[in-house]
C-alpha cells in the first residue's frame, strides 16, 4: 500500500484590526472610502471613526486626490478657508463632508429646470390662464428634458431659491473671493405669437436680503419673426462676503392677449458654482 500523504495546515494569518492602527494611518485608510459609504457605513462604527469622519483631515485628503486644474485650485483654497463650527441641528455633518457628498461644483443647482416634474421646486404665480408645461418647439442643447414652461396673456412668474450652503458650498469658501456663480436660462416664443420675457437673479445673504442682482429684459419677440429658444447668461464674480442664497426669478407673457398659452417659453434654467482658476 502506498504511503498516505499528510496535509499540513498552515497557521491562519491573524486578521488586521483597523482599530489597532495608529490614528494617522487610519485616517489615510478611511480617506479611500467613497464619501457616502464613509458617512453611512464608517461613521457609526465607533466614536473614534465618527470623530475622524466629523473632522476635516479625511475630507481634505479626498480633495487632494483630484489633480485636475479645478481640483488643485479648490484644495489650495480649502486649506486657507477651512469651515468653522456650524450649528449641529441645522448641519449634522461637517461642511467638508457635505461638500464631498453633494459635489456642488459644475452641477446644476436648479431643481426641475425643464418642468419634467411639473412645478415641483418652484414658487409659481399664475397670470391669465397660468403657466403650462409643453414639449419644446426646437431642441435645447444639453437640457435634461425637452420640455418647457409656457406663460399666458398676463404676467406669469416663478421663482426658485437655491441654498448654496445646503448644496455643499461652505460659507468660508463662498466668502473667499475665489468662487464664481454662473446663471443661465433659455427662453423663446412661438412663431405665431410674440412674447415678452424677463430674468432676475439675486444673490442674498443669510437673512435673504439682496446683496447683488442681475437683470435681463431682452427685446420682445414679434409675431411671425422667429421661433425656438435662445440663451441668457451671466457670471457673478467678486460678490463680497455673506452670500448664502441665489434667487432665480423668471417673468413672461404674450403680446397679443390671446387666451391660452402663447407667451414666453422658458427652460433649462441653471445655477452653477465653480472655482476661479486665476
From Swiss-Prot:
Record-linked InterPro entries: F-box-assoc_dom, F-box-like_dom_sf, F-box_dom, F-box_only, Galactose-bd-like_sf
Gene Ontology CC annotation, any one: cytosol
One GO term of the biological process aspect: ERAD pathway
Domain of life: Eukaryota
Keywords noted in UniProt: Ubl conjugation pathway
Gene3D superfamilies, alphabetized: 1.20.1280.50, Galactose-binding domain-like
Subunit structure and binding partners: Part of a SCF (SKP1-cullin-F-box) protein ligase complex. Interacts with SKP1 and CUL1.
PANTHER family from the UniProt entry: F-BOX ONLY PROTEIN 17, F-BOX ONLY PROTEIN 6-LIKE PROTEIN
UniProt name for this protein: F-box only protein 17
Species assigned in the record: Homo sapiens (Human)
Lineage: Eukaryota, Metazoa, Chordata, Craniata, Vertebrata
Gene from which this protein is expressed: FBXO17
